Amino acid sequence: MAFKYHKVAIIGKHYKKEVSQMVETLYAYLQQQGLEIIIENDTAVDTSLVNVAIASLKEIALRCDVAIVVGGDGNFLKASRLLALYSNIPVIGINKGKLGFLTTLAADDNALKNDLYAILKGDSSVTKMSMLKCRVDNNLRAPLEASIALNEIAITASRGLMFGLKVFIDGRYAFDQRGDGLIVSTPTGSTAHAMSAGGPILNPNQNSVVLVPICSHSLNSRPLVISDESVIDIYITDYNDPEPVLSIDGRHDTILKAHQKVTIQKARKKVTVLHTKDYNYYDTLREKLGWSKVLF
């Protein structure tokens, strides 16, 4: 069976030796298969490879058939989110990090020769990961890449003081909250910051988002799962003279003031992730979270 994907991009984590070594191994393997290979600019600098084709993330998204991201979940998160802004290029994750929720292929010879080989031949399963976009005070001029989240959008305390929020969903008043903040998470992000704050785990294929309070000053405040078609408006109240921080996937921090409004809704773009044919999301949860393990 011929390869389904012929032009393959490799993206690694900058300044990480073990990732660079894996990139070189991966490059050699793909070259043996007769595939055309392009390496992301910063990734190529960290390797000993010479006379290789290089490109930016935008160029990769527009020119390549598939992108392989080598590293941890953070590197996968950053690269796949940016690639999705420019095209529907599918992404494969090879884990050279710690947890590996998103980078589901192992970084070993067996995974290359069997799992990756099969995926590149087209024998794979697909997950479509939804993203969120936000704007502050209806500002539509913010750069798109600074407004899109694959995991979560969080509003958190900046000075060790709790602050107040007023939340509307689809134009209807939902609740007030005082505490350390609020996380609005995608299904992908439900196993990240949102889970640490006590939120539920959502299947990546579920068309939902979850609102998770952070250390709410009320026993009645609970996580809320809603449709991902909903529009969420969050107003900062003047309680405690707040200066909370708006973070998008842990980056692009913006200091907010009282009476400002943050609007969050589903982004039009999705991240397309390729897995092995027998990939089971619940296997990943069981392995990474230690389900069914004997504790004592």
From Swiss-Prot:
Catalytic activity reported: NAD(+) + ATP = ADP + NADP(+) + H(+)
Signal peptide annotation: none
Family annotation (SUPFAM superfamilies): NAD kinase/diacylglycerol kinase-like
InterPro entries per the UniProt record, alphabetical: ATP-NAD_kinase_N (IPR017438), ATP-NAD_kinase_PpnK-typ_C (IPR017437), NAD/diacylglycerol_kinase_sf (IPR016064), NADK (IPR002504)
Principal location class: cytoplasm
One BP term from GO: NADP biosynthetic process
Record EC number: 2.7.1.23
Transmembrane segments: none
Cofactor(s) needed by this chain: a divalent metal cation
Localisation: Cytoplasm
Keywords (A to Z) from UniProt: ATP-binding, Cytoplasm, Kinase, NAD, NADP, Nucleotide-binding, Transferase
Enzyme class, first EC level, given as a word: transferase
GO cellular component: cytoplasm
PANTHER family in the record: NAD KINASE
Family the UniProt entry places it in: Belongs to the NAD kinase family.
Described purpose of this protein according to its UniProt entry: Involved in the regulation of the intracellular balance of NAD and NADP, and is a key enzyme in the biosynthesis of NADP. Catalyzes specifically the phosphorylation on 2'-hydroxyl of the adenosine moiety of NAD to yield NADP.
The protein's name: NAD kinase
